[in-house]
């Protein structure tokens, strides 16, 4: 799997559609079309101050999935295919922000969810560049961009949307934060040297200004 495909952060549903299409569909045109469709659906709904209901905005995640999902198995080796992941991030973040604003989700809660997502994606990108991609089970458990959008859209049909935002933020925070912390605790930084600071401080030993060892008073 190429790095660009990892950056897409596809979930089980998108991956299933990609396998069905067999990697034959070019990803960029369909992703751009998905972004345009999301913009149109958000422009005509949801209506501010109302609960999510059978209006165009609730179907935006499904439309994006059907447009961008089948291209998920493509190798993404085209000259401009690197644009696909940031477009998907814009679709997901924009949808959650607009939906949260229209459904009276507290602004701090919207920011918390978006921050957790940003950290989740940053961690995946950084680890991929260091040659330590997140495990497959973590990527699947993270639901993918399509799973998170579908969850927030349809969870609002059963309960107030703030609960869905809070639940998703907590779930992703525990999943991504816990697994990432455990991974770095085991391996340390790629290419670096792990230092036991507790041991060094207890010994009171450090490096002098010229590289020699010196004893702290």
What function would you assign to each model-found segment?
Residues 1-70, 82, 86-128, 133-217:
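Hydrophobic alpha-helical transmembrane segments
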């Amino acid at each position: 799997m190429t790095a660009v495909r990892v950056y897409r952060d596809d979930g089980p549903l998108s991956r299933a559609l990609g396998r069905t299409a067999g990697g034959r569909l070019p990803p960029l045109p369909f992703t751009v079309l998905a972004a345009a469709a999301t913009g149109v659906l958000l422009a005509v709904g949801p209506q501010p101050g109302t609960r999510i209901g059978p209006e165009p905005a609730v179907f935006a995640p499904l439309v994006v999935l059907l447009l961008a999902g089948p291209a998920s198995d493509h190798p993404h080796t085209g000259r401009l295919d690197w644009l696909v992941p940031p477009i998907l991030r814009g679709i997901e973040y924009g949808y959650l922000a607009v939906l949260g604003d229209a459904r009276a989700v507290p602004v701090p809660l919207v920011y918390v969810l978006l921050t957790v997502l940003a950290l989740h994606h940053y961690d995946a990108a950084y680890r991929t560049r260091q040659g330590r991609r997140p495990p497959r089970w973590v990527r699947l458990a993270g639901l993918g961009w399509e799973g998170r959008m579908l969850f927030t859209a349809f969870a609002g049909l059963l309960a107030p949307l703030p609960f869905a935002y809070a639940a998703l933020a907590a779930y992703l925070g525990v999943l991504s934060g816990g697994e990432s912390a455990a991974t770095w605790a085991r391996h340390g930084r790629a290419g670096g040297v792990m230092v036991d600071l507790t041991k060094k401080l207890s010994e009171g030993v450090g490096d002098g200004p010229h590289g020699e060892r010196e004893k702290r008073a």
